[in-house]
Amino acid sequence: MVLIRVLANLLILQLSYAQKSSELVIGGDECNINEHNFLVALYEYWSQSFLCGGTLINGEWVLTAAHCDRTHFLIYVGVHDRSVQFDKEQRRFPKEKYFFNCGNNFTKWDKDIMLIRLNKPVRNNEHIAPLSLPSSPPSVGSVCRVMGWGQTTSPQNTLPDVPHCANINLLDYEVCRTALPQLRLPATSRILCAGVLEGGIDTCNRDSGGPLICNGEFQGIVFWGPDPCAQPDKPALYSKVFDHLDWIQSIIAGNTIVNCPP
């Protein structure tokens, strides 16, 4: 444990853009309350159980993982501590849901994306502000930020009231293909591979749908990770936002016929 803490602290010193240091997402640090204005929480409507994270990309639209979909769910914006109702938080319902169904040059691994139109726009405040879509694709070796209300212990299921943040590295896709042979990942894909190969830092269950932010840009959506979480040499998979920009922007613009990306 002492060694893990030392390694984590050395990594943190190298992260120039991070607003708050994180040792581990599993048992790690609480996100700075001003760091996640775009992070939303999805809840199952009837049970009021927490499902997933998501990202507010403008006042009326949220991007999350398709596997987070339920027949009825709620979206909370501006939340920090889930156990306390905050004056500035806002609740919305899905008005429309869109799923990425393009077939050309996209495999099943490239389609875990859901775009949600809210029933009414949110009002920006000091705790609510959208995160812009990326202007360019991410580079391997980038330092990336992940956050969410997912498990802080694994395999034990411990969910925190506040979001936890961590810094991980964007890895070459081949690293995930080699490390995760049971998935039989295709030779080429539009998913991102990210993690800390030494282990101890990772997203986990219920972090699904949340953002992967690399060098300050929204580059990925939490998609899949090994169980237990944070194992050495077991990185996780993220949907690549940049390769879905045409689809996202076409829907937001109101196009009824969406052209699939090349």
UniProtKB/Swiss-Prot annotation:
EC number: 3.4.21.-
MF term (GO), any: toxin activity
Disulfide bonds, paired cysteine numbers: 31-165, 52-68, 102-260, 144-214, 176-193, 204-229
Pfam families for this protein: Trypsin (PF00089)
Tissues with expression: Expressed by the venom gland.
SMART domains: Tryp_SPc (SM00020)
Domain of life where this protein originates: Eukaryota
One GO BP: proteolysis
Places the protein is found: Secreted
Signal peptide (UniProt feature, chain positions): 1-18
Maturation propeptide residues: 19-262
SUPFAM superfamilies xrefs: Trypsin-like serine proteases (SSF50494)
PROSITE patterns: TRYPSIN_DOM, TRYPSIN_HIS
Predominant cellular place of this UniProt entry's protein: secreted
Claim: ATP-binding is one of the keywords in the record: no
Keyword vocabulary terms for this entry: Blood coagulation cascade activating toxin, Disulfide bond, Glycoprotein, Hemostasis impairing toxin, Hydrolase, Protease, Secreted, Serine protease, Signal, Toxin
GO CC field: extracellular region; secretory granule
Glycan-linked positions: 105
Function: Thrombin-like snake venom serine protease. Displays a specificity similar to trypsin. Releases only fibrinopeptide A in the conversion of fibrinogen to fibrin. Shows coagulant, esterase and amidase activities. Reversibly increases the permeability of the blood brain barrier (BBB) in mice. Induces the barrel rotation syndrome in mice, which is manifested by gyroxin-like, rapid rolling motions. This syndrome may be due to its effect on BBB permeability, and certainly also to other actions affecting endogenous substrates present in the endothelium, nervous tissues or blood.
Other facts: Negative results: does not have phospholipase activity, does not aggregate platelet, and does not affect the release of the neurotransmitters dopamine and acetylcholine in the nervous system.
Membership in a protein family: Belongs to the peptidase S1 family. Snake venom subfamily.
Subunit structure, interactors included: Monomer.
Name of the protein described by the UniProt record: Thrombin-like enzyme gyroxin B1.4
Highest classification ranks of the organism: Eukaryota, Metazoa, Chordata, Craniata, Vertebrata
